[in-house]
Regions:
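A conserved ligand/cofactor-binding region detector
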Residues: 1-6, 10, 23, 35-36, ...
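Periodic, rod-like helical contexts
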Residues: 16-18, 26-31, 38-39
Length: 487
């Protein structure tokens, strides 16, 4: 089985080479030699050791993206086959400057020098539709069918980035989708003098992979975010289904070969999109398609705030994804029938558990869709998962008690200890060996040295040295003297 991780945020930083070298155990004194060799080979942005780039990860791809990067590193190290899917954004969130004590955001052109670790795969591009209309018909066997006729299309071109495991021969893959136009230039519009119209489709399609987190304070911004979400989940699902087709595996066996993790609600449109493909394209029955869908997906929730749980307006979904809205309505109708059967007469419970918020501004609760369409739901910690069951999804926990579990998120020690603090990592290895790099639970053996004065002295020396380095950097970049005793 292949683990598949859907994550809209950017998931790897520009210091990918440094991460890779850390996995290969290239030590700090040798990094400067590697840096010179990389620059000689023309590797863009290869700055290592003391010249290592100092960029805030959150300003580039978001916390969820950083978490996804840790998962991919861990999966590769555990030698578990996995693919991480996302969007190949042309711009990050922003580059941060501090002027007169205030944050100033400037365009983050992180791809301006190219990215040597990615491999374009244009022969594996996918077509994605938006808007349009639906029409119903009867197939050759007299079954009721629906056909979606989009009026807008984009092409998703995959770019693959290798993710190497630590001290193993496993290489997993990050596949990022770049948006291209199906028609890049309209000669007719150009010839009649409509120069903007001649490239309108190209600009509109390529906007899908321009920037992470477009401003959703406007109708156009919200529409772009929705289209981004559908774009990358549609491309990713098509890619998975294509891999089965190439091996002659029937779509009914999809969950036996792909386990899809929804990292928060941003990829939840994958549920109606997979249903659409299975029903409308592969022509499965609803029951077979739904059992396949639920067996495929698992959902990780990242927030306990009800107001922060993602919702999309029905009006917007109807304009951008009309067929998907129909499928969501059908999922909701069938689900509420089950709730009604188990809790007859409890109208308030039906209202609370419905996927659709009724009223003047009707909307779809994406978190409810994720819970109903997945076979497993977890929070990011033991406490978080318990609060989900007792508060946020209490009704769903009563209805699907076997569906909720506590699976704690974590970080990779290779990135956040061995690479981030090499002197401390070396000190730990000196006393307990290097097994902790693959098994973080081995750090517990440090408790045996809790009263070891020699280790305590060396530990404090490492901390002091790191403070000196930070104070020097602040002085070099900002001209501000800082006492290390204040850190």
């Amino acid at each position: 089985m292949m683990i598949e991780y859907l994550q809209r945020d950017g998931v790897l930083a520009r210091d990918h080479l440094v991460d890779d070298l850390a996995r290969r155990d290239v030590e700090e004194p040798r990094l400067s030699l590697v840096r010179r060799g990389a620059l000689a080979l023309g590797v863009a942005g290869a700055k290592l050791a003391e010249d290592r780039p100092h960029h805030a990860g959150a300003a580039r791809g978001g916390g969820l993206g950083r978490l996804a990067a840790c998962f991919l590193d861990s999966l590769a190290t555990l030698q578990i086959p996995a693919v991480g899917y996302g969007i190949r954004y042309e711009f990050g969130i922003f580059d941060q400057l501090i002027r007169d004590g205030w944050q100033v955001e400037i365009t983050d052109k992180w791809l301006k020098g190219g990215w040597p670790w990615e491999i374009p795969q244009p022969d594996q591009a996918c077509f994605v539709g938006f808007g349009g209309r639906t029409e119903s018909y009867r197939d050759d066997k007299g079954n009721y069918r629906v056909r979606w006729i989009p009026d807008e299309h984009a092409i998703g071109v995959p770019h693959d980035v290798p993710v190497l495991g630590y001290r193993v021969n496993t290489c997993d893959r990050l596949r990022l989708w770049r948006a291209d136009a199906s028609e890049s230039f309209d000669f007719y519009a150009f010839n009649i003098g409509d120069y903007y119209g001649a490239v309108e489709e190209k600009v509109g399609s390529e906007t899908l992979s321009k920037v992470l987190y477009p401003n959703d304070g406007t109708d156009e911004g919200r529409r772009l975010r929705l289209k981004q979400q559908h774009f990358f989940v549609s491309c990713s699902l098509q890619d998975m289904l294509r891999s089965l087709d190439q091996r002659g595996i029937p779509v009914q066996e999809f969950p036996d070969h792909w386990a899809v993790q929804l990292n928060d609600t941003h990829p939840t449109l994958a549920i109606p999109e997979l249903m659409r493909i299975l029903i409308d394209v592969e022509q499965l029955t609803w029951e077979d398609a739904w059992s396949t869908c639920v067996a495929t997906f698992a959902y990780t929730n990242h927030t306990l705030l009800p107001e922060a749980l993602e919702q999309w307006s029905v009006e917007l979904l109807e304009r951008v994804l009309p067929r998907h809205l129909q499928i969501i309505y059908e999922i909701n109708s069938r689900f509420l029938q089950q709730v009604k059967h188990q809790h007859p007469g409890d109208i308030d419970r039906l209202r609370r558990m419905s996927l659709v918020v009724e009223g003047d501004n009707r909307s779809v609760r994406m978190s409810h869709l994720a819970v109903v369409g997945s076979h497993a739901v977890n929070g990011v910690s033991q406490l978080h998962s318990e609060l989900l069951r007792r508060q946020v999804f209490r009704d769903f926990d009563e209805f699907f008690p076997e569906r909720f579990c506590a699976t704690t998120n974590g970080i990779t020690p290779r990135r956040w200890l061995k690479l981030a603090n090499p002197r401390l990592a070396d000190l730990i290895t000196e006393y307990i060996g290097d097994g902790w790099i693959r098994d973080l639970s081995q750090l517990e053996s440090l408790a045996n040295y809790a009263h070891n004065e020699e280790l305590a002295s060396k530990w404090q020396a490492v901390k002091r040295n790191n403070k000196l380095r930070l104070a020097k950097r602040i002085h070099d970049e900002q001209g501000i003297e800082i006492s290390i005793d204040s850190l």
